[in-house]
Amino acid sequence: MEVNILAFIATALFILVPTAFLLIIYVKTESQNKK
């Protein structure tokens, strides 16, 4: 079974992008709460 590189990249982006977005929001919220 051949691995589709584009499909793998698309899946990785689909998972990583929202995760990074939520992580950034979490860090910003934490930094605001600590002040």
From Swiss-Prot:
The chain crosses the membrane at residues 5-25. It is found in: Plastid, Chloroplast thylakoid membrane. Keywords: Chloroplast, Membrane, Photosynthesis, Photosystem II, Plastid, Reaction center, Thylakoid, Transmembrane, Transmembrane helix. One of its GO terms (biological process) is photosynthesis, light reaction. Belongs to the PsbM family. PANTHER family: PHOTOSYSTEM II REACTION CENTER PROTEIN M (PTHR35774:SF1). PSII is composed of 1 copy each of membrane proteins PsbA, PsbB, PsbC, PsbD, PsbE, PsbF, PsbH, PsbI, PsbJ, PsbK, PsbL, PsbM, PsbT, PsbX, PsbY, PsbZ, Psb30/Ycf12, at least 3 peripheral proteins of the oxygen-evolving complex and a large number of cofactors. It forms dimeric complexes. This is Photosystem II reaction center protein M. It comes from Panax quinquefolius (American ginseng).
